[in-house]
UniProtKB/Swiss-Prot annotation:
Disulphide-bonded residues: 4-18, 5-14, 10-17
Keyword flag Repressor: no
Organism: Conus marmoreus
Protein name: Conotoxin mr3b
Note on domains (UniProt): The cysteine framework is III (CC-C-C-CC).
Record carries keyword Disulfide bond: yes
Length: 19
């Protein structure tokens, strides 16, 4: 899975969410 750290991380299917 992608690893993202932005406000919409969960909505874009990224994991983990950093907030």
């Amino acid at each position: 899975s992608k690893q993202c750290c932005h406000l919409a991380a969960c909505r874009f299917g990224c994991t983990p969410c950093c907030w």
